[in-house]
Every structure is written in structure tokens, then in C-alpha cells.
Amino acid sequence: MRLQILLRGFSSTPQTGFPRGDPVRLHGNTTTGLPIPLRNSSSNQILLREGRGDYPDGARRETRRYYQGPTPTPRSLSPPIYRPPPSYEESRRRRKLRRRQDGRVKYPASPYRTKPPGETSSDDEDEGRGGHEPRPQRRLPRGLRDRGERAPERRRPPVQEGEEDVDGVGALLDDLKLYQEPPGDPVEDSDSPGSRLTPAPPDLSRYDSTRLQVDAESSPPRTPRPAPTLVAECTPGRPSPQTGSGQQALGEPPSRPSRGHCRDPRTACLLIIKGSSNQVKCLRFRLKSWHHSLFSYISTTWQWVPSVGSNRIGRSRILVMCEDSAQMDRFLCTVKIPAGMTVEQCSMASV
């Protein structure tokens, strides 16, 4: 008998954990007879994550796990659903829908919008669009405008009574208009290697080549300004520059024109200096820098070219103009011409 009682005592399952007692309420939750957990225990941290439990400062706060914002409502107890922002087409469709509901239209009616044949716009539709006037036609940029008719041609003012029109002047001005292409078929430019076409010049053969004279009553006569005389004849004993005797070999002393070649001392004298490009440029710089008082004008460096093509012919040249023979004599006596260069007196025919 005693053995059976001992076996029953050993076979009974021992009770583990906290002793069970009457149910108690912990912060509104019915629990078993468990003691109140400490505020810094792991159980309290679990309750805090679930929205229950005490904070270390002793105050209870209503917390939520997913939603951070104002006081929750019955609809916001569940976690919020992430919605991506609407696309551009969706937002545009919503704006159109709101305008249609409010009775507003973005753009007024325009007569340039095409409609199917047989369909006409009513007054109600125009009123629904706002009743605005049609927009003006948009101006195209300068480069995209259609090339329509040309601007009206510039005409001469009508001849008033008492004035005399010179024969051929009106027709000549009509042919030489600034913004009008000259009549005639385009001709090919021989200088350019490509197939570039240039308009033919106007035909001026039907006009009088004599100098036009204006009546003294219409405008007072103007005295022509005398041009400087550039022609200077050479002495009979000196050969002409056209014969080529003025050409000089490289290394020989430069030739100088003889004195007393100008008959009239007041006649302007013209000298032509020839040499290589570098020699002529250096001499011109030296003349303009230190001997500018010995001449009146000096040209830039130039060379001859044939009628067809652009190949340079001969040596480089410069022209020096003196006021009279006395100034030319001072120029020849003062300026030292480098070896290999030639200086000759010439006229416009020999240039």
C-alpha cells in the first residue's frame, strides 16, 4: 500500500513555472495569475511593439506599428497601402475629367481645327468653349516662311511739270535695281572650276554712252574735280619700259632713272619698284617708317595675274607717287634701293 502511494507521488508531473492563481486584468487584458512584468523587461518590450505596455517614464501611450500620423480612426487601423504616383497620362485624364465636370475648357474654339465633312459647329458648342474669338494665325519663323511674291519694285518718282527727263536714265535704273535679278539667262563663270552660275549683266548697248548733261535750270552745273596727272614721259635717249630693258639680273646694282625726265616740274611722278615679295614688303615698311616725307602716296604689294586663273606672274611690285620732279630727286638720292630690285619711272600705261 505504501509502495503504491510512493509510486503515485513520483509518477505525478511536477508543476513548472509560476504558480497558477485566479485570472487578473493587466492593462485591460485578461491574463492568468502571472505577475506584472517589469517596465524594462523583455516582455514589456514585446508589449510596446504590439501597442501595449508601459514606457519607462510611467505613462501609457497609444502606439501603432505601421502608421505614423494623427490619432488613428477605425479605417486607419490597418496598415496603409502604398500607391505609386499617377502617370502623366492619368493625371492629364483626371484634369480633363474635372474640367468637364466643372464646365471649363482649357482652349477656346478655333476655326483652324478640322472637322468631318457635313458636321458644323453650333452656337452651344461655341458658348461651351468660352465664346472667345478665334486665335490669330501663328507667325512662322523667318527661315520657314513661304517665299511668295517679291516686294513691289522700286520705281522712280514721277517727273513733275517743268522738269526734263534725260533719255535712257529711267530705263537704265529699272535694269539696275538693287533687289531684282538682271534679265538674261545665267551664264557659267569661267574663273570657278565648279558649275556655279552667275546672272548675265544687263544689256546696256541701247543706251547712249555719251555723258549725260542736266539742264542748267533743274540743277546748277558742277565743276569736275581735276584728277592728279600720273603720266610722265621718258627722255628720248632712254628706252621705253615696255621693251623690257628695265629688267635687271639678280645681284647687279639697281638701275636708277635719269634726272630731268619730267618736262613740267609740277607734274606728279610715278615710280615702280620691283623685286621679290619679301624685299618689296621690307622696303615698303622702311619707306613708311623713316622716309614718309619723300613721297605722297605708296601702294600695297601687288602682282599681275592672267585673264584666266589666279596664278601670279612676274615679281612683286609697289608704286610710289611723288608730287613733282624735285621730290622724286630727293627720294632717289636719299633712299637706298637694295640689290636685286629695280626702280623705274613709269606712266599708267607701263604699270
Swiss-Prot record:
Keyword Manganese among record annotations: no
GO cellular component labels: host cell nucleus
Pfam families: PPV_E2_C (PF00511)
Main localisation: host cell
Keyword annotations: Host nucleus
GO MF entries: DNA binding; DNA-binding transcription factor activity
GO terms under biological process: regulation of DNA replication
Subcellular location: Host nucleus
Ranges of Polar residues composition bias in the record: 28-46
Biased composition (Basic and acidic residues): 49-65, 143-158
Region of interest: Disordered: 11-262
Source species, domain of life: Viruses
Function description: Plays a role in limiting the replication of viral DNA in keratinocytes. Recruits the host NCoR/SMRT complex to viral replication foci to mediate repression of both viral replication and transcription.
Family: Belongs to the papillomaviridae E8^E2C protein family.
Name of the protein: Protein E8^E2C
